[in-house]
Structures are given as C-alpha cells and as structure tokens.
Amino acid sequence: MGQKVHPLGFRLGVTQKHRSQWFAKPQEYSQLVLEDHFLREELNKRFPNSGIIDLFIQRKVDRTQVEVEIRTTRPGLLVGRKRQNCDKLKQLRDELQVELNKFRAKNGVSPTAKVALQVTTVQNKSSEAIVIAEFLVNQLERRIAFRRALRRVLSIIQRDRVQGAKIQVSGRLNGAEIARSEWIRTGRVPLQTLRADVDYCHREAKTIYGILGIKVWTFKGEIKPVRKAVEVPVA
C-alpha cells in the first residue's frame, strides 16, 4: 500500500525552510524546542483569528536574543494601525518576554534571552492553505452544507487566480451515518515535483455530528533554481 509523504517536509531545503533556525548543544536542545513550541502556542492562543500563516524563530549563537517573525494576512489585529504600530509591537514583545521568562523559570532555566518581533504581511492570502482550511472550518462549524462551502472556497480561489488547489473533507458529511471522504481540485497540484511551491494544511472542524478532517493543498508556481556561471580558467 502506497504511503503519502508530508508535502512540506518533502520539500525542506528546496522550496521550504525550517520554521526554527538555530544550533544548540545536546543538553540544551530539548529546552529550546519546548520554548519554540511555547511561543507558537502563546501567539496562536492570543490571536486565534488574526490570519497567522507562519512563525519563524531564529536564535543567536550566544542565546541572548530570540527573533520571532510572524507572517500574517491581517497585521492590523496584531499591531494596530500605522500610528499604533510601534507601541503595540513593543507591548506585544514585552508581554511575550514576561511569559517566556516565566516558562524558563518554571523549567529551572535562567531567563536571559530577549525577544525581538517582526511582523510580515502576506499579500495573496487565497494561495495560503491555512487560510482556506480555517475558512472551511468556520463554515462547517456553522452547519453550512459542505458542498456549498466547497463551492464558495472554489470561487474565491478561481477569482484570485491561484494556480492550483486541492481540498479534501472527511467524516460524517452533512450528518451521514457512514463517514466518507470527498475532494475537489482546480488547476494543477504537482505533489511529486520538488521545485513546485506547494503549501499544505490540515485542520479539524468540530460539528454536532463529530469531527470533520480538512486537508488543503495549494500550488503557487514552480521555483526554478538559479544557475551560477562557472568561470573556466583560460590556459
């Protein structure tokens, strides 16, 4: 029986990069992984509907600074309008610093690392798999028929000219007694092409009939490798 590899892990180092980028000694590694997980959970808990796409975390070699880059489609919910950007960003940074210090003290680690925040705006949100998945979760939890929700998502994807998308919904669809899976696709979604910029997301919708699983793949285009010219010495 064939197995399906995770689309993002399959492309690490080609079109995808690691969400956490740092080096650590073996005895420090587990603590830093826990800190990264804590920061992600804290930000997603504080801003559940702010359109956060990705969180990239980098650390300096001497562990004095933690740099967190937040990619979001709705930066106004995170840092406010233009005049309030600096103040709200500083306030959010200070609050994260306090929570991180508490977490480190709880685990018996001295709170030395300072938090630095950067917010990046994502322009074409319809090509992001997490945006489509969360929209579908919202529709299905409001008891909208899954076919109508899928058609609505499909019209948005086609309107914004996304190159390709595939959506799969599994579970007791529309309250049926027997669970099943249904999917739709538009455009191209080349899952076996490494240079293809494919995004993927999995979410769960909690309905009165049970949990529905939602998987979304989006294709943003092919990233062609840059070929460097090689100088050949002339004899």
Swiss-Prot record:
Similarity comment text for this entry: Belongs to the universal ribosomal protein uS3 family.
A Gene Ontology term for the protein's cellular component: cytosolic small ribosomal subunit
GO molecular function terms noted in the UniProt entry: rRNA binding; structural constituent of ribosome
InterPro entries (UniProt xref): KH_dom-like_a/b, KH_dom_type_2, KH_sf_prok-type, Ribosomal_S3_C_sf, Ribosomal_uS3_bac-typ, Ribosomal_uS3_C, Ribosomal_uS3_CS
Assembly, per entry: Part of the 30S ribosomal subunit.
Database matches in CDD domains: KH-II_30S_S3
Compartment annotation: Plastid, Chloroplast
Superkingdom, taxonomy of origin: Eukaryota
Domain KH type-2: 39-123
Keyword Ribosomal protein: yes
Record-given protein name: Small ribosomal subunit protein uS3c
Coiled-coil region(s): none
Organism: Oltmannsiellopsis viridis (Marine flagellate)
GO aspect biological process, one term: translation
Pfam families: KH_2, Ribosomal_S3_C
UniProt KW keywords: Chloroplast, Plastid, Ribonucleoprotein, Ribosomal protein, RNA-binding, rRNA-binding
